[in-house]
Amino acid sequence: MSVGMGIDLEAFRKSQRADGFASILAIGTANPPNVVDQSTYPDYYFRVTNNEDNTDLKDKFKRICERSAIKKRHMYLTEEILKKNPELCAFLEVPSLDTRQAMLAAEVPRLGKEAAEKAIEEWGQPKSRITHLIFCTTTTPDLPGADFEVAKLLGLHPSVKRVGVFQHGCFAGGTVLRLAKDLAENNRGARVLVVCSENTAVTFRGPSETHLDGLVGLALFGDGASALIVGADPIPQVEKPCFEIVWTAQTVVPNSDGAISGKLREVGLTFQLKGAVPDLISTNIEKCLVEAFSQFNISDWNQLFWIAHPGGHAILDQVEASLNLDPTKLRATRHVMSEYGNMSSACVHFILDETRKASRQNGCSTSGGGFQMGVLFGFGPGLTVETVVLKSIPFP
């Protein structure tokens, strides 16, 4: 259709669209330097929160940590910080939100910047080529948001188009890929910087006999940030894609209200986790796979490479059993969980990074461990599932 003085708006619309799928062009990760050993964490935790006399509860926490399949985690909160801010070590008795947010407002963008700089360095292109920024966190609700702060720390151009993804939790690592795909494929030449930065200072608190799900969270979560450069139609010989984002979906698991939830209050973000979560995910995940891969005539889930959010070892065990997966399929997920714990939205990007690196080190033919097609799953509050179909890139 032509309008005005011979302007062809339809041609203009088509010219704005990319030709190919969005690709992940670079990945960067970052963690705080403070490392917590899971085997000694119960003793440390009950000491710094002044609960050493509660030996029965400490024994329960030890068993939770022993069953977590986690070796170590990175945490911003050190013993020195906790001693200076004892309100963080109370359970729900003392308001602490101001203290937490003062920390998070600085640390969340800072760690995000660190991951972003690594991704930009790998990408090898000037920051001036970044057209969009997607920033994700489940921590700080300040205005302007952490997206603004990261853009400022990185020195991005003021015209970079920002999108904030806040309070989504563990499924958001898939959400940001879905958004990045839409932005990259509908804006020719766009280069989208995706940053996820998560910090457990928002949830750390003392123990309680009446809130054992809080102890589960304290045994699982760690701090980390991830960053990716996403764009369609990579420049040959200049940009080096590692995965293509083929298809995305989001769904809410039936009858799962309240299975995973968090409430931001004066005492920080309180965490609720029901024991039914592994069952809910494992009994519904095949529906997501069928929806995603029937259009590609794929029904053998062992013919995919897997990037699954490590919500906990019970979830992974039940998914593996329900789908009869080869144990190698979740190897990268289990490795990241073991070394870093559950870093919420950033986790699946760490697993993507681990998958491509292990694939090259092991002499595989593609970035997906020798497989062409793969799936990325994010699980989180709702209970929400993000499904992302990925295509690997052949190694030269």
Swiss-Prot record:
Q: Which top-rank group of organisms is this from?
A: Eukaryota
Question: Which residues does the record give as substrate binding sites?
Answer: K60, F61, K62, R63, L273, G311, G312, H313
* InterPro entries per the UniProt record, alphabetical: Chalcone/stilbene_synt_C (IPR012328), Chalcone/stilbene_synt_N (IPR001099), Chalcone/stilbene_synthase_AS (IPR018088), Polyketide_synthase_type-III (IPR011141), Thiolase-like (IPR016039)
Ordered alphabetically, the record's keywords are: Acyltransferase, Cytoplasm, Stress response, Transferase
Influence of pH = Optimum pH is 6.
Q: Which family does it belong to?
A: Belongs to the thiolase-like superfamily. Chalcone/stilbene synthases family.
Name of the protein: Pinosylvin synthase 1
Organism, per UniProt?
Pinus strobus (Eastern white pine)
* Lineage start: Eukaryota, Viridiplantae, Streptophyta, Embryophyta, Tracheophyta
